[in-house]
Swiss-Prot record:
PANTHER family: NADH-QUINONE OXIDOREDUCTASE SUBUNIT A, NADH-UBIQUINONE OXIDOREDUCTASE CHAIN 3. Its main location: membrane. It catalyses: a quinone + NADH + 5 H(+)(in) = a quinol + NAD(+) + 4 H(+)(out). This is NADH-quinone oxidoreductase subunit A. Keywords: Cell inner membrane, Cell membrane, Membrane, NAD, Quinone, Translocase, Transmembrane, Transmembrane helix, Transport, Ubiquinone.
Amino acid sequence: MADNAHYWVLLVYTFVVIALVAGMIGVSHFLGQRHLKRATIEPFESGIVTVGYARFRLPVQFYLIAMFFVIFDLEAAYLYAWATAVHAAGWTGYLVIAVFILALLAALAYLWRAGALEWGPKPRALAIVRRR
């Protein structure tokens, strides 16, 4: 009987979440605006009239920096998990995390050497332009 209690709690929780989401969507549908004029379609940003088109392509460097952040942020989570259990891990855990940190440093050195962290023009391209 005690094992089934966990399933009932999960079922009730799922039902409550679905009912809450459906209720929020329903209330916003019934209370929301029904007309689509030019003034209601445009975004309102601190009373400033919008200028230009907001959907433009970002340079690829933004994508690369975001990917590097996600990758190195996950490693920070692993390091935090190791730091909370450092006494239980012992010397074996210390050696494993040392290898892990060395792999991180090698990856960072590779990215730095490959120029993935550079935002400006490539130095090689600048040298070619200066020779002309």
